């Protein structure tokens, strides 16, 4: 049994890790909304909007780096992240011409920011389920704060509203060590120790073993993803569903996808129900988009993604349970979820940029 103090301490740490894991998406969101203007800076706009799928891919690539090397990168990464954010802050306040310096700064800092989701998820999904919800709450809250800052035009008025970004970096990086030292986390790590390996080693799931244990879950996630991508294409061409959403949807796709949703009951049943709801809602939008009006159409279109997120959350939770004896189970979860993020954000970029409704 663990004390209440240990649970509260770990809950606070993983909440801060959720704030930290949101930073690459917030970085992309801020640049895409503040510095993107297709008329005056076309190539910069493409760089910033492609930042979302790039961040997802880089987060996946960081999972291929051995854990000991990833941990060693923490100190230089946080120093460069804060330095880059300070330079961006200074450019916003004191410089009137950022058409070259800002894209270079954006591209230099993004790969290092993508380290944080890997380190955070590697810790969080070894902890009990209640602490995983605190992590997801932190990530969702961070994305919501910056989305509201853009909606209210606070970021356009003053660069001071970038300050939460610095707070997220400071709190999150400081919480990494605290979470690792917590006995709840270390006991979860101990349960993944292999009895057939030398002292200090843990069981690791290979690609073959992952495919053997979770074939239907991966197939169902792929089928759901293909279904929703087809829905996006059809509704974009026929119903102009992205009108007014292109500024905010990429952050929603990244944030909500990484946060998951509610999953109750059997994963396959939840996935089937959510796929059915996605299909029915898309049919309603397709045939009644003129009757629904802009607000009704937007609400129903967003609800399609909420259903999808809930279905994938149920399937990914089932995958984590099947891989609970392996220390890299959380990284498998990250790869699957962030590849789904990549597919959606890249598809949204292609549709909005090249396929006019």
UniProtKB/Swiss-Prot annotation:
It holds the Pfam family Herpes_BMRF2. The keyword Lipid metabolism does not apply. Extensively glycosylated by O-linked oligosaccharides. Keywords: Early protein, Glycoprotein, Host cell membrane, Host membrane, Host-virus interaction, Membrane, Transmembrane, Viral attachment to host cell, Virion, Virus entry into host cell. It is found in: Virion membrane; Host cell membrane. Residues 1-11, 33-46, 68-70, 92-98, 122-133, 155-158, 180-217, 239-240, 262-267, 289-298, 320-335, 357 are virion surface. It is a multi-pass membrane protein. A motif (Integrin binding site) lies at residues 199-201. InterPro entries: Herpes_BMRF2. GO terms for biological process: symbiont entry into host cell; virion attachment to host cell. GO terms for cellular component: host cell plasma membrane; membrane; virion membrane. The chain crosses the membrane at residues 12-32, 47-67, 71-91, 99-121, 134-154, 159-179, 218-238, 241-261, 268-288, 299-319, 336-356. Facilitates virus attachment to oral epithelial cells by binding to host beta1 integrin family. Participates in rearrangement of cellular actin to increase intercellular contacts by binding BDLF2 and thereby promote virus cell-to-cell spreading. Belongs to the herpesviridae BMRF2 family. The RGD motif presumably is the main binding site to host beta1 integrins. Interacts with BDLF2. Interacts with host beta1 integrin family. This is Protein BMRF2. It comes from Epstein-Barr virus (strain B95-8) (HHV-4).
């Amino acid at each position: 049994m663990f004390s209440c103090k240990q649970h509260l301490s770990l809950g606070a740490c993983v909440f801060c890790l959720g704030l930290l894991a949101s930073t690459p998406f917030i970085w992309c969101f801020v640049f895409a909304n503040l510095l993107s203007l297709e008329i005056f800076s076309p190539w910069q706009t493409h760089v910033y909007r492609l930042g979302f799928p790039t961040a997802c891919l880089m987060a996946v690539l960081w999972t291929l780096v051995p854990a000991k090397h990833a941990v060693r990168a923490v100190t230089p990464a946080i120093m460069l992240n804060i330095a880059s954010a300070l330079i961006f802050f200074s450019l916003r306040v004191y410089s009137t011409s950022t058409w070259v310096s800002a894209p270079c700064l954006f591209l230099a800092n993004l790969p290092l920011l993508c380290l944080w989701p890997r380190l955070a998820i590697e810790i969080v999904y070894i902890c009990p389920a209640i602490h995983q919800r605190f992590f997801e709450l932190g990530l969702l809250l961070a994305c919501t704060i910056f989305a509201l800052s853009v909606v209210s035009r606070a970021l356009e008025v003053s660069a001071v509203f970038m300050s939460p970004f610095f707070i997220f970096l400071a709190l999150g990086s400081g919480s990494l060590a605290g979470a690792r030292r917590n006995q709840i986390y270390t006991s979860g790590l101990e349960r993944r120790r292999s009895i057939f390996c030398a002292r200090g080693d843990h069981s690791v799931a290979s690609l073959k073993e992952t495919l053997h244990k979770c074939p239907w879950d991966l197939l169902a996630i792929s089928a759901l993803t293909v279904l929703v991508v087809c829905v996006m294409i059809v509704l974009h061409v026929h119903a102009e569903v992205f009108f007014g959403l292109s500024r905010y949807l990429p952050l929603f796709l990244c944030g909500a996808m990484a946060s998951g949703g509610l999953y109750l009951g059997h994963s396959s049943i939840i996935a089937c129900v959510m796929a059915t709801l996605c299909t029915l809602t898309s049919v309603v939008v397709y045939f009644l988009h003129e009757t629904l009006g802009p607000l009704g159409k937007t609400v129903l279109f967003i609800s399609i993604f909420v259903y999808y997120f809930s279905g994938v959350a149920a399937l990914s939770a089932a995958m984590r349970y099947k891989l609970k004896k392996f220390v890299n189970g959380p990284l498998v979860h990250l790869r699957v979820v962030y590849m789904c993020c990549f597919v959606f954000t890249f598809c949204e970029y292609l549709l909005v940029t090249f396929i006019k409704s």
